[in-house]
């Protein structure tokens, strides 16, 4: 088929605005799936995606549409994740398209991720077609959304297509708009091969498979290809496209979207954003914008209950084959035994990894408090160390010249009645207000700069509970900044517990330490000897609690008689408890670790 009849597009939307349903309808309308294959969220293949109603992995589907002008067009739909953790993947998917459908829920209006993804599409020079979805809902307010499209995004509201993916309204109009408004791909099949990888997955039979958009040249089985970021070479075994099923083709040429399999053993060799070219006749320039995946949040994952360290290691290895964004290294802790320090893209990514490990690989795990990467510059040296684990943070504050932590720009869109409490929350989280505007009389747009460490614990839950679920937010990394941070260590009977170290802001240290000590007092069971809980900052104790010992009634067998007899027995007991305290070990239950994660 000629290149002028090809269209590459993606759908961008906030979580839950009906993206996957619209994709299903387009596939049905163009006959890509038969009646028999219909099911909800056809492109969301992971269990987690279906249950949470979110898209994590991307898919790229080919379909054919006979337009009103009598020509048949080849359409490639690239489905993108909507969540902030996967923003780099979204940017690569947009780079593979010429146009985008911007989907907006008629009852919710424009939300934070709508705006964030809209600007990403504008940066890539895509043609944007606004679609107002869910117009069949009783709460739909189309005029309000049109006004927002004009005022917030600066698009012509009359160009917006009214649709309901669920009822199948407006689907033909959308397909006509894709054909008429989105330009065909430019590219020269005669030039050397240049293909952008925008997703990958692991197939037990084909090895690691790359989903690509071909910009120049063509590729067929038997070709020798090279990955430009690593210089590794492979021989192509199969090329094809998803028509939702994986379908083999003889070749892929300029303008096409499809997959390349080359019996690559490790999915990590296929990096999202990398460029594939021919080994013998490579292209001069790779596709711009490649970045290796960079974890923002780290946490310790340890085996729990009857899972062994080996089982956890095998599960992580298998999982990492499919998720190139995760990094992990072994670590051990006297309190929790052997485990791993794992890096994630963000909090949602972390939850999904935990859930998939437990569900798909059957391991039971315990996760320590998530933390970000701090940069510590020591005095008298030029070296800056990256601290991924609070245990590695230097104890002696006198040796530290400065500490930096990652900051993010948070954008929040909320109904106006919740503005007060949300501003208060952002101030508690050390946020600095940068902008506040009214999108319409009832909706407010806020911008804050705040530390990532404040967001990763409970910011999402708090914002949703304050606004009864109506507010939405999005954040992007803006760089490292100096902060007044200190390390707190928990001592139990004067012995430090490594897994209970925290890095907190100096202003909060006192309050935080007190809460930790109280929580531990509630969760550590009473022993036969007194337990002292202390929270120290640089060797100085700033909060402490004690758990009284259990004791037998040693004077029960004395009937009357001399008081000195009772005194002697009590003195003996006291001596025994003292010795016990010296040599006794306190076993910390798992609840003790978990309770401290929830401390504010």
From Swiss-Prot:
Query: What's the catalysed reaction?
Result: GTP + H2O = GDP + phosphate + H(+)
Q: What start-end ranges are recorded for coiled-coil regions in this protein?
A: none
Task: Write down the top EC class of this protein.
Answer: hydrolase
Compartments reported by the entry: Cell inner membrane
Give the binding site residues for GTP: 16-21, 133-136
Chief place where the protein resides? membrane
Family annotation (Pfam families): EFG_C (PF00679), GTP_EFTU (PF00009), GTP_EFTU_D2 (PF03144), LepA_C (PF06421)
Q: Which UniProt keywords apply?
A: Cell inner membrane, Cell membrane, GTP-binding, Hydrolase, Membrane, Nucleotide-binding, Protein biosynthesis
Cite the tr-type G domain residue spans from the record: 4-186
What would be one Gene Ontology cellular-component term for the protein?
A: plasma membrane
Q: What is its EC number?
A: 3.6.5.n1
- List, alphabetically, the InterPro entries matched: EF-4, EFG_III/V, EFG_V-like, EFTu-like_2, G_TR_CS, LepA_C_sf, LepA_CTD, LepA_IV
Q: Which cysteines are joined by disulfide bonds?
A: none
Which NCBIfam families does the UniProt record give? Answer: lepA, small_GTP
What name does the UniProt record give this protein? Answer: Elongation factor 4
| Organism per entry | Aquifex aeolicus (strain VF5)
């Amino acid at each position: 088929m000629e290149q002028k009849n090809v269209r590459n597009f993606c759908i961008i939307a906030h979580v839950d605005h009906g993206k996957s349903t619209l994709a299903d309808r387009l596939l049905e309308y163009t006959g890509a799936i038969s009646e028999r294959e219909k099911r909800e969220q056809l492109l969301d293949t992971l269990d987690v995606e279906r249950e949470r109603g979110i898209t994590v992995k991307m898919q790229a589907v080919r379909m054919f549409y006979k337009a009103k002008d009598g020509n048949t067009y080849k359409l490639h739909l690239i489905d993108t994740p909507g969540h902030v953790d996967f923003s780099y993947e979204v940017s690569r998917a947009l780079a593979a398209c010429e146009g985008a459908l911007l989907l907006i829920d008629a009852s919710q209006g424009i939300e934070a991720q709508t705006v964030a993804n809209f600007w990403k599409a504008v940066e890539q020079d895509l043609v944007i077609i606004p679609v107002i979805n869910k117009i069949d809902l009783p709460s739909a307010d189309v005029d309000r959304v049109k006004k927002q499209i004009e005022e917030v995004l600066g698009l012509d509201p009359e160009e917006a297509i009214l649709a309901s993916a669920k009822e199948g309204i407006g689907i033909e109009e959308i397909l006509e708009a894709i054909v008429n408004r989105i330009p065909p791909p430019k590219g020269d099949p005669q030039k050397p091969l240049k293909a952008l990888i925008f997703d990958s997955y692991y197939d037990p039979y084909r090895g690691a498979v790359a989903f690509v958009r071909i910009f120049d040249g063509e590729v067929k089985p038997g070709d020798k290809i090279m990955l430009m970021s690593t210089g590794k070479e492979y021989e192509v075994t199969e090329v094809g496209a998803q028509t939702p099923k994986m379908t083999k083709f003889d070749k892929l040429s300029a303008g096409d979207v499809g997959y390349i399999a080359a019996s690559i053993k490790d999915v990590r060799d296929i990096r999202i954003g990398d460029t594939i070219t021919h080994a013998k006749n490579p292209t001069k320039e790779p596709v711009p914008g490649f970045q290796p995946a960079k974890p923002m949040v780290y946490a310790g994952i340890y085996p729990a209950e009857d899972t062994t360290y080996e089982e956890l290691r095998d599960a992580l290895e298998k999982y990492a084959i499919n998720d190139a964004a995760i990094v992990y290294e072994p670590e051990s802790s006297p309190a929790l035994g052997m485990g791993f320090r794992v890096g994630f893209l963000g909090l949602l990514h972390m939850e999904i990894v935990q859930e998939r490990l437990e569900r798909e690989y059957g391991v039971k795990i315990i996760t320590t408090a998530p933390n970000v990467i701090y940069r510590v510059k020591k005095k008298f040296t030029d070296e800056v160390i990256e601290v991924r684990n609070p245990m590695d943070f230097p104890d002696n504050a006198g040796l530290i010249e400065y500490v930096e932590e990652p900051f993010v720009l948070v954008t929040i869109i909320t109904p106006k009645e919740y503005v007060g409490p949300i501003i208060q929350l952002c101030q508690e989280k050390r946020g600095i207000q940068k902008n506040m505007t009214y999108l319409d009389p009832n909706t407010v747009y806020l911008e804050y700069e705040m530390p990532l460490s404040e967001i990763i614990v409970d910011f999402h839950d708090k914002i949703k509970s304050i606004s009864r679920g109506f507010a939405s937010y999005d954040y992007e990394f803006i760089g490292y900044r100096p902060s007044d941070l200190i390390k707190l260590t928990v001592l139990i009977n004067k012995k430090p517990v490594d897994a209970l170290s925290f890095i907190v802001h100096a202003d909060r240290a006192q309050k935080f330490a007190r809460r930790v000590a109280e929580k531990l007092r509630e969760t550590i069971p009473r022993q036969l000897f007194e337990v002292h809980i202390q929270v120290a900052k640089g060797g100085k104790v700033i909060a402490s609690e004690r758990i009284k010992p259990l004791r037998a009634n040693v004077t029960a067998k004395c009937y009357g008689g001399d008081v000195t007899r009772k005194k002697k027995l009590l003195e003996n007991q006291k001596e025994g408890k003292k010795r016990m305290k010296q040599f006794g070990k306190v076993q910390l239950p798992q609840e003790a670790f978990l309770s401290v994660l929830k401390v504010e």
